[in-house]
From Swiss-Prot:
Coiled coil segments of this chain: none
Subcellular location: Cell inner membrane
Superkingdom as given in the UniProt entry: Bacteria
Family: Belongs to the UPF0161 family.
Protein name: Putative membrane protein insertion efficiency factor
Keyword Cell membrane recorded: yes
Species lineage: Bacteria, Pseudomonadati, Chlamydiota, Chlamydiia, Chlamydiales
Purpose: Could be involved in insertion of integral membrane proteins into the membrane.
Length: 103
């Protein structure tokens, strides 16, 4: 990992640390009360990991804004990145098996 990439990951890692602390310390006290799948904290974790700091935070804020009695909830997965959208058809054809690449 380059130093520049490492520096870009610092805000993501700080946010992930806050999310993990919430999941370990606060969430068990509240119980399972999220009206979405995945839960809002897991959604935020996935969004930050796949979309980076700015877009991950934006997606997380939008999701938390929907989490209330005014929204029915349900399944709400993190949107795919552009790269995931491009690679998905090839993964379906390949079946996700990369054994043909090994010697």
């Amino acid at each position: 990992m380059s130093f520049k990439r490492f520096l870009q990951q610092i805000p993501v890692r700080i946010c992930l640390l806050i999310i993990y602390l919430y999941q370990w310390l606060i969430s068990p006290l509240l119980g399972s009360c999220c009206r979405f799948f995945p839960s809002c904290s897991h959604y935020a974790e996935q969004a930050l990991k796949s979309h980076g700091f700015l877009m991950g935070c934006w997606l997380s804020i939008k999701r938390i804004g929907k989490c209330g009695p005014w929204h029915p909830g349900g399944i709400d997965m993190v949107p795919k990145t552009a790269l995931q959208e491009v690679l998905e058809p090839y993964q379906e054809i390949d079946g996700g098996d990369s054994s043909h690449f090994s010697e």
